[in-house]
A protein has these predicted regions:
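Zymogen propeptides/activation segments of proteases
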Residues: 1-159
Length: 160
């Protein structure tokens, strides 16, 4: 099975920001592009990783915190049934993963996104001012944005 790395903000948009943004915007856009290129090279490795499945019909969400670093998945900060953490990005990711599971269950009668009970994992606070979010074949990863052009990527259910 081959997995693709799917980004929310496409590379051509980041290249335009790198060309036309102010100094800090250009720096963050170039940093995001560089990290994105590194992940494209890891695509094959991710596809070889085992997928963890939940018991049929059970919602199972896990949210990790990269703490502005680049190591995935990061530190586990919230699992299925755990109370709200008070970290807005963590709680938005958790709630968004739940809405995603519920959508697939109620509209498509699927057991998670793959119909085989796939655990829904995500990592928040990825990178320093990382201007993107992506699916790496096994989890969603959310940057917090630079605060000028992009805000945290957990704010929009369309991203999650």
């Amino acid at each position: 099975m081959t997995y693709s790395i799917c980004y929310i903000v496409p590379p051509h948009i980041l290249r335009e920001i790198a060309k036309k943004g102010n100094n800090s915007q250009r720096a963050w856009a170039l940093q995001t592009l560089t990290i994105s290129e590194q992940f494209r090279g890891r695509r094959e490795v991710v596809s070889l990783m085992p997928t963890v499945f939940a018991v049929a019909g059970e919602k199972r969400r896990t949210v990790y915190d990269a703490k502005s670093g680049y190591v995935l998945p990061g530190t586990l900060v919230r699992g299925e049934g755990d109370p709200s953490t008070g970290d807005v990005a963590v709680d938005e990711a958790y709630d968004g993963l739940g809405a995603t599971y519920d959508l697939y269950k109620s509209v498509f009668d699927r057991n998670s996104i793959d119909d085989r009970g796939m655990r829904l994992d995500s990592t928040v606070h990825y990178g320093a001012n990382y201007d993107n979010a992506f699916w790496n074949g096994s989890q969603m990863v959310f940057g917090d944005g630079d605060g000028e052009i992009f805000q945290r990527f957990t704010k929009s259910i369309d991203v999650i």
